[in-house]
Swiss-Prot record:
Disulfide cysteine pairs (residue numbers): none
Protein name (record): Holliday junction branch migration complex subunit RuvA
CDD domains with a match to the protein in the record: UBA_RuvA_C
SUPFAM superfamilies: DNA helicase RuvA subunit, C-terminal domain, Nucleic acid-binding proteins, RuvA domain 2-like
InterPro entries: DNA_helicase_Holl-junc_RuvA_I (IPR013849), NA-bd_OB-fold (IPR012340), RuvA (IPR000085), RuvA_2-like (IPR010994), RuvA_C (IPR011114), RuvA_C_sf (IPR036267)
Record organism: Nitratidesulfovibrio vulgaris (strain DP4)
Subcellular location: Cytoplasm
Entry remark concerning the domains of this protein: Has three domains with a flexible linker between the domains II and III and assumes an 'L' shape. Domain III is highly mobile and contacts RuvB.
Chain intervals for the UniProt region annotation (Domain III): 155-202
Gene responsible for this protein: ruvA
Length: 202
């Protein structure tokens, strides 16, 4: 399963872009609207955390700027009646913390602002989000690693590297070095820095 793509932006079409890796492989990646708006010019470097959606007739990649956004997409698409396209539309309208606020504030009607979602569907999605979304993460980020003790960022980034196939010992060593040098990184930043370090053979 593809979980991370980094490379050169080759093309943008609709809500998708083509990313060509340093190895010369091109991937079509569907991204939220706010991510599309911040893409660099063609030839610029981009990186996405990927959720791979497999259907009978297609394999599609959905890309996100942060690990939190990717995980929120997975939560959304685990809800019945919410496919990948609807999940992407929701995340084009609301960031993960916005969705958590909707849950905390019990603002079910806000979801009807998303194209294709009526009141009945919004109520269904909202009910599922109440049980599946981690509202305790709002608004502060997870605790950082300090003094070498694994904190929330360390644990989540380590889990992300494990999902990408890295061994715990190697990933833990690199993450500790990364967070020691840059203690203010969030989970996504720590993952990207660790992946770059691992790619250099560190």
């Amino acid at each position: 399963m593809i979980a991370y793509v980094e490379g050169r932006l080759a093309e943008v079409a609709g809500n998708a872009c083509v990313v060509v890796t340093d190895g010369g492989v091109g991937y079509e990646v569907f991204v939220p609207g706010h991510t599309l708006a911040r893409l660099p010019d063609k030839g610029g470097r981009v990186s996405f955390f990927i959720s791979t959606e497999v259907r009978e007739d297609a394999l599609e990649l959905y890309g996100f700027a942060t690990w939190d956004e990717r995980q929120t997409f997975i939560v959304l698409t685990s809800i019945s009646k919410v496919g990948a396209k609807t999940g992407l539309a929701i995340l084009s309208q609301f960031r993960p913390d916005d969705l958590r606020r909707l849950v905390v504030e019990d603002d079910v009607l806000a979801l009807t602002r998303v194209s294709g979602i009526g009141k009945k569907t919004a109520q269904h999605i909202f009910l599922e989000l109440k049980y599946k979304l981690k509202v305790e993460d709002l608004p502060a980020a997870a605790p950082l690693v300090t003094g070498g003790a694994p904190g929330g960022v360390f644990r989540d980034a380590l889990a992300g590297l494990a999902n990408l196939g890295y061994g715990e010992e190697e990933a833990s060593h690199v993450l500790k070095e990364v967070l020691h040098g840059e203690p203010d990184l969030d989970v996504g930043g720590a993952l990207r820095a660790a992946l770059r370090a691992l790619a250099r053979g560190r």
